[in-house]
Curated annotation (Swiss-Prot):
Designated gene of the protein: cclA
Disulfide bridge positions per record: none
Outcome of gene disruption: Impairs tri- and dimethylation of H3K4. Results in sensitivity to 6-azauracil. Leads to increased production of several secondary metabolites, including gliotoxin. Does not affect pathogenicity in a murine model and the Toll-deficient Drosophila model of invasive aspergillosis.
Assembly and binders: Component of the COMPASS complex.
Organism (species): Aspergillus fumigatus (strain ATCC MYA-4609 / CBS 101355 / FGSC A1100 / Af293) (Neosartorya fumigata)
Protein family per UniProt: Belongs to the cclA family.
Lineage start: Eukaryota, Fungi, Dikarya, Ascomycota, Pezizomycotina
Protein name: COMPASS component cclA
Length: 618
């Protein structure tokens, strides 16, 4: 069947009527086409006008779709704007949070009843100061835990006096205020008493194991390896062959501060650098010392921090602070007292021969990160102040300050109105990720505050004294009349706070779960076929079913807390029989009436239970 095409049509002709070319011949359309096979097409427009002008108008290029959308010229193709999904903030205040269900654990091992062993030290280098005429040996801590990746680590010990939570807080030697082994990077080296630190490469920071939350606290730092002192007579030949002695920075830092940088690189630290005595905060250096004066080897730098009472601090972060009613924060902290609900969401685990706690650490907030890297002096979210309504992390503490002394001489107060740190100004990282999304992110574990911090670079070394005997000594009172105390006194206070918090956790666990009836825990139904607790993120999320222990269903509640009298007896005996000086948690809780440690006998296992084994982490 042949196709029929009207005459004058512009469409192609049928393949049947089209001639075929033999192979090897020239293309068909290279010559003149006969009228029979010619294709009809409309006549092209006349080009006479174009040829006479000699020029051709430039074609206008059409804007791209993105440009048209930006100019608002192509409204039809603009996709509809998505509604911003506001994530509901389910975080609860620390005062409204209760203890999490203790994990289902095997019975403590005999070794769990013993305190943690001293850290193993490996010799690295020796620093000698010609100005001071002393030498210091520095060691690397072998196989140490480091606070990172959103988690913080501490040490635990099994105690039969705590049948519900089974373990309580403890620490590793040396038992005094010092630099923390866990709160420092691996590049930091310690002296044997952990009061002196150094680093051989880039900037690294070490934080102490004591923090200031309210009141006036003081510590001293002496440079043992740094900028040479003017009294050191060095010839030209000696100076050319003399190795650099490094640099140091001193100050205070919060737990959110980066330890792989120098103190003051962000909004979470306040420091002073040895070169020219410049003060540093959020990467901004400002002149502070007189011109030509620096911090040199042998100099003693005193750091005094003053913080308002926690009662005023809470009003600032809650947004209820009124200076006309609450004052300006200059009144001594002894005039105002407040109750604090310490929430420590911890997971116990074995690490080699030790038993440790793992808990969420605080993380830096977006507002302060943006402010630290903002080149403008006025941040996008408004200037930091006690009344900043954008975010609690941008609020500052009235009456707070940091004063710096050099060799006993007061140099001035470079930092005032320090950033608030109580939750929700500080937020805990979640167990699943570091976004801090969850109802327990505002929990206060009692160790959120400002820590003494020292940064070292290229071999710089610093020795600190957190309590007497001092090299120089602090003033008797701060500018607001607050009595000045050595921050090392916080060591014993933190032990007492840990002991009280452990007792409160045990009593709360006894009252809430001591008389479990059926499969209902705290008015929340749990699957009767539950296989016990699961660790990690499910427990930190606060799920009742995640930490439910079905073994306690058949155990009478009264039989479980028959040994709770040991708590008060051990506490009383530890306080009366402890030696003068520093206390330890073992002195407070594990010392009997005769002054000897309690025997390492594990508590009696529960009836009708199947012993399980904990998974060791290495």
């Amino acid at each position: 069947m042949s196709s029929i095409q009207p005459v004058g049509s512009s469409g192609p002709s049928s393949n049947i009527n089209s001639p075929t070319l033999p192979p090897g011949t020239a293309p068909f359309f290279s010559g003149t086409v006969t009228g029979q096979n010619a294709r009809s097409s409309p006549a092209p427009p006349s080009n006479a006008s174009v040829q006479t002008d000699g020029t051709r108008s430039k074609r206008n290029k059409r804007d791209s779709r993105k440009k048209r959308e930006a100019k608002g010229l192509d409204q039809e193709s603009i996709p509809p704007k998505k509604k911003a999904a506001v994530a509901p903030n389910s975080a609860l205040p620390s005062s409204d949070i209760s203890i999490l269900r203790p994990l289902l654990l095997a019975e403590p091992r005999a070794s769990d009843l013993l305190p943690p062993q001293p850290r193993q030290l490996s010799f690295v280098s020796r620093k000698t100061s010609d100005v001071l005429g002393q030498s210091w040996d520095f060691y690397e801590v072998v196989d140490k835990l480091t606070n990172k990746n959103g988690f913080r680590y501490s040490y635990a010990i099994a105690d039969p006096g705590f049948p519900h939570i089974k373990y309580r807080q403890t620490d590793v030697p040396p038992y005094h205020a010092r630099f923390s082994f866990e709160d420092s990077p691996a590049a930091i080296f310690f002296s044997e008493d952990a009061r002196a630190v150094t680093a051989s490469s880039a900037w690294h920071t070490a934080r102490a194991n004591v923090c200031a939350r309210e009141g006036a606290y003081y510590y001293e730092a002496r440079v043992i390896n740094g900028i040479p002192n003017n009294s050191q007579s060095i010839s030209a030949n000696e100076s050319s062959h003399r190795t650099p002695k490094g640099h140091v920075r001193l100050g205070f830092a919060r737990r959110e501060a980066d330890l792989d940088a120098n103190v003051g690189v962000d909004c979470y630290g306040y420091g002073i650098r040895d070169v020219n005595g410049e003060v540093v905060n959020r990467m901004r250096c400002e002149y502070f010392f007189p011109k030509g004066e620096s911090i040199r080897e042998g100099d003693v730098i005193g750091m005094l921090i003053t913080l308002p009472p926690l009662s005023l601090h809470k009003k600032v972060v809650e947004g209820t602070y009124d200076p006309a009613v609450d004052g300006d924060g200059t009144s001594p902290t002894s005039e105002a007292h407040t109750s604090t609900n310490l929430i420590r969401d911890r997971i116990p685990f074995h690490y080699k021969s030790d038993f440790c706690w793992q808990q969420s650490n605080v993380f830096s907030t977006k507002h302060l990160r943006d402010y630290a890297f903002n080149l403008k002096e006025t941040p996008t979210f408004g200037p930091p102040s006690p009344f900043n309504s954008e975010d609690p992390s941008l609020r500052t503490l009235p009456g707070s300050s940091i004063t710096i002394f050099k060799n006993g001489e007061k140099m001035g107060t470079p930092f005032k109105e320090l950033y608030a740190f109580l939750p929700p100004a500080s937020r805990l990282a979640n167990g699943t990720n570091n976004l801090g999304i969850g109802e327990r992110e505002n929990a206060d574990d009692g160790m959120i505050g400002y820590y003494p911090a020292v940064s070292c670079y290229g071999g710089g070394a610093v020795e600190c004294r957190f309590e007497g005997p001092w090299w120089v000594g602090p003033p008797s009172h701060a500018d607001n009349g607050e009595p000045v105390r050595g921050i090392g006194e916080r060591f014993n206070e933190q032990i007492v706070e840990d002991v009280v918090a452990d007792i409160v956790d045990e009593v709360e666990a006894m009252l809430i779960w001591g008389g479990v009836d059926g499969d209902v825990v705290g008015n929340a139904e749990v699957d009767s076929a539950g296989a016990g607790a699961v660790g990690g993120s499910e427990v930190l999320k606060g799920g009742v079913g995640a930490a439910f222990d079905p073994r306690l269903d058949s155990v009478p509640g009264a039989a479980e807390f028959a040994d709770t009298e040991n708590i008060s007896n051990g506490l009383e005996a530890g306080v009366t029989d402890a030696d003068a000086g520093h206390l330890t948690t073992e002195d407070t809780l594990s010392v009997g009436h005769e002054g000897s440690p309690n025997p390492a006998t594990p508590s009696a296992p529960l009836e009708n239970t199947v012993p399980t084994e904990d998974v060791e982490m290495s």
